[in-house]
Amino acid sequence: MTASSLRIASRRSQLAMVQTEWVRDELANAHPGLEISIEAMATQGDKILDVALAKIGDKGLFTKELEAQMLVNRADIAVHSLKDLPTNLPEGLMLGCITEREDPADALVMHAKNKDLTLATLPEGAVVGTSSLRRLAQLRYHYPHLTFKDVRGNVITRLEKLDSGQFDCLILAAAGLGRLGLGDRIHELIDPSISLHAVGQGALGIECRDGDAAVLEQIKVLEHRPTSLRCLAERAFLRTLEGGCQVPIGVNTRFEGDELVLTGMVASLDGKQLIRDELRAPQDQAEDLGNRLAELLRSQGAGEILAKIFAEARPEA
């Protein structure tokens, strides 16, 4: 990189490219004359589509290949959906900035035959498609009469599977649908009382080399402080629980006056156990808030739930 150039690593999926091109355009507007290039590539999570995400492994499924490009100086930044970025990054890399969050809610997308129904009124045995253990566990807890099936592929592929009749509905991130111009497919936004969203959902995280002052100066225009505070608390919560992106851990954050309020949840995969609580703290104590809520849930049994999940997921020797 020179002071007048910036190389961006991105996944090559349609949604990833939309997000990366938005970052490129915002940086180009902020820095006239900056030469920006995008290197798109497939990650492990993109390549393995016939296995549930949780069975592949967890650390960096959608990020490792992008990070490798930065570590060998073939890219200067990587653009991630923040929910896919592990809380512990490889040595030499850092989370440079977090963009303003879109709606972090989970969204219900219905098959046309169910257009007059809601998630709450779907009949027994209706087939719900989701690749997220977090969504699966929470929905099993609230709607044990429904049937859940794994669905993989990019957003367009998943919608095609829904429309072909393989599912009665899908649960997807509202932000991703919106960024793809598919907001009209959202049948309802799932209330946080039913489904807490993933850590970082709806925000983009821009990763860079640790201490790269020139790059940090270039990307700081995209930093959104309120989103950063919320996500700092969420990521601390996840890190302290020693959870990853593919475990049933959910969060919700909101501001009330000068305080940040964090709600957190851990559930068993069968949906029979769900531990949920909430804490608040001054905004400048966001990370400590996440740590404290994680310890509170641990004291209520969350550690045992997660230990069982990790033990069952561990491959046989």
From Swiss-Prot:
Q: Which reaction does this chain catalyze?
A: 4 porphobilinogen + H2O = hydroxymethylbilane + 4 NH4(+)
Q: Which Gene3D superfamilies does the record associate with it? A: Periplasmic binding protein-like II, Porphobilinogen deaminase, C-terminal domain
Entry keyword set = Chlorophyll biosynthesis, Porphyrin biosynthesis, Transferase
State the top-level EC class: transferase
EC number(s) in its UniProt entry?
Answer: 2.5.1.61
Look up the record and name the pathway of this protein. Answer: Porphyrin-containing compound metabolism; protoporphyrin-IX biosynthesis; coproporphyrinogen-III from 5-aminolevulinate: step 2/4; Porphyrin-containing compound metabolism; chlorophyll biosynthesis
Identify the PROSITE patterns for this entry.
PORPHOBILINOGEN_DEAM
What is one cellular component GO term in this UniProt entry? cytoplasm
**Which InterPro entries does the entry mention?**
HemC (IPR000860), Porphobilin_deaminase_cofac_BS (IPR022419), Porphobilin_deaminase_N (IPR022417), Porphobilinogen_deaminase_C (IPR022418), Porphobilinogen_deaminase_C_sf (IPR036803)
Q: How is the cofactor bound?
A: Binds 1 dipyrromethane group covalently.
> So which cofactors does this thing need?
dipyrromethane
Q: Which SUPFAM superfamilies match?
A: Periplasmic binding protein-like II, Porphobilinogen deaminase (hydroxymethylbilane synthase), C-terminal domain
S-(dipyrrolylmethanemethyl)cysteine PTM sites in chain numbering: 245
The coiled-coil regions, if any, are: none
Entry's Gene Ontology BP terms: chlorophyll biosynthetic process; protoporphyrinogen IX biosynthetic process
User: Which HAMAP family does the record cross-reference, listed alphabetically?
Assistant: Porphobil_deam
Give the misc comment: The porphobilinogen subunits are added to the dipyrromethane group.
**Into which family does the record put it?**
Belongs to the HMBS family.
Entry-linked PANTHER family: PORPHOBILINOGEN DEAMINASE
Q: What does this protein do?
A: Tetrapolymerization of the monopyrrole PBG into the hydroxymethylbilane pre-uroporphyrinogen in several discrete steps.
Oligomeric and partner information: Monomer.
- The protein depicted here goes by the name Porphobilinogen deaminase
In the UniProt record, the gene name given for this protein reads hemC
